[in-house]
Amino acid sequence: MSKYIFVTGGVVSSLGKGAAGAALGALLEARGLKVTMLKLDPYINVDPGTMSPFQHGEVFVTADGAETDLDLGHYERFLSTRMGKRNNFTTGLVYQTVIEKERRGDYLGRTVQVIPHVTDEIKRRIRLGAADADVALVEIGGTVGDIESQPFLEAIRQMAVEEERGDTLFMHLTLVPYLASAGEMKTKPTQHSVRELRAIGIQPDVLLCRADRPIPADHRAKIGLFSNLPEKAVISAIDTDSIYRIPLLFHAQGLDDLVVQNLGLHLSAPDLSVWNGIINALEHPEGEVVIALVGKYVGLTESYKSLAEALLHAGLRARRSVRFLYVDAEDVETQGTEILAEADAILVPGGFGGRGTEGKIASIRHARERKVPYLGICLGMQLAVVEFARHRAGLMNANSTELDPQTPAPVITLMTEWSDPEGHKAYREEGGNLGGTMRLGEQECRLEPDSLAIQAYGQERIHERHRHRFEFNNRYREPLAMAGLRYTGFSADSELVEVVELPDHPWFLGCQFHPEFTSNPREGHPLFDAFMRAAIAQRERDGSS
């Protein structure tokens, strides 16, 4: 039977429940437990797949093809467990399921209500997602007091009653602000948040108090007094320069000891050698590398969360600190590629729509002509093909049909048939629904010999995650190859081009898949490691330190 740790938040949103929960999960995993995590999102969208990155941040894609909250990226980076469709669900998905059951007659004519039907569906999905794990950490999105969160909070309250005593634990994340005008930290917001949580029947067992500085013992004692908790259960969750310090910060305050004790587990001390090694690499870089990330959503860097983390992982492994130049592609259109001059390497990530496209293409041309290392991911690969077609193959009006449906040279076109992660055929028509209609999830890719890709991965067959509707148009394979473009990665059936390279460039690679989704701080990712080595070599060629 699984044990459950429910993670809630109060005072304000975006306090870092996902990172905090994942850090605790890492500590429990370091004690030998099998840990999984779930994210429950209170919004009505069925999934975040069609939500604007400016509102929601990154959409994280799991191996089984789920479009999920970015917190699942935190979960996979901190834990060895791979997440899937069961690990993230929304109010919209819950209501969709309940309504479908009602239409089928599953409720036998009963009046369908939030309690018990919606809450029962939430509990069913929690238990399903926790199956086979020793401990499941369940993060409730939003904050206590939100109307949208109430069914989820009621469901976990009921679970605490239904599960065996000692099999559930409530961890509440709050804010303890410092008021400069008063010169002190204020505990009242946390007291009110806990009071609101207790009013709906949930008594927290642990408080994680976010603050920009350590919380004094007398403040923690005061918070504990008004929350019915001992001082040791009030943990300082202070700001840090890297989320990978959080497991060690929590362990130093005894959080994992407290949780293990409350859950009635008898375990040995955690093996934190991996996390100590990560922090050692973080604190002792041997140089700096500057990576330009040219994108559409740089106004909210959370849109590229997994990508930034993957580059940081590569930097850790190469003993380099990574400095990002987040470049708005539209700024390249108005200011020119001179704003990329400082970059040791250039990356164009995935994205949708036409805004900023010409700026990305100009950045790719800059990387190609100046011999600057380039990595294009998803749309970044597609636009590399467009740029090459225009300026090397003589197809001056080349484009993607996503960006120009009437282009006379559609080198990138809509994909209408593909295989899903289970091997079943999937189809999409022009004008169909946007939600859930992309090629999603882990797919096999076959790499060509004597290529940058196979040098990076060290094997012919790899598996990477996808999220795209458009693909390389095979009608243009031969003319672009004759102009010098090399295809070095293909889908398992050889129908789809998945990796392109330029043999006359030191390091230029575009991939249709998203390698950032499988990188973690323990093992990194071979493609980002290779990209980082190329960036370091470029910096050394330029004579920078």
From Swiss-Prot:
Name the domain of life this protein comes from.
Answer: Bacteria
Provide this UniProt record's keywords sorted from A to Z. Answer: ATP-binding, Glutamine amidotransferase, Ligase, Magnesium, Metal-binding, Nucleotide-binding, Pyrimidine biosynthesis
Q: What is its EC number?
A: 6.3.4.2
List the GO biological process terms: 'de novo' CTP biosynthetic process; pyrimidine nucleobase biosynthetic process
Q: Note the InterPro entries from the entry.
A: Class_I_gatase-like, CTP_synthase, CTP_synthase_N, GATASE, GATase1_CTP_Synthase, P-loop_NTPase
Q: Where is the active site?
A: 378 (nucleophile), 514, 516
Its UniProt entry gives the catalysed reaction(s) as: UTP + L-glutamine + ATP + H2O = CTP + L-glutamate + ADP + phosphate + 2 H(+); L-glutamine + H2O = L-glutamate + NH4(+); UTP + NH4(+) + ATP = CTP + ADP + phosphate + 2 H(+)
All residue ranges annotated as the Glutamine amidotransferase type-1 domain in the record = 290-541
Q: Record-annotated residues binding ATP?
A: 14-19, 71
Q: Which NCBIfam families does the UniProt record give? A: PRK05380.1, PyrG
Say what the protein does: Catalyzes the ATP-dependent amination of UTP to CTP with either L-glutamine or ammonia as the source of nitrogen. Regulates intracellular CTP levels through interactions with the four ribonucleotide triphosphates.
Q: What is this protein called?
A: CTP synthase
Q: Which gene encodes it?
A: pyrG
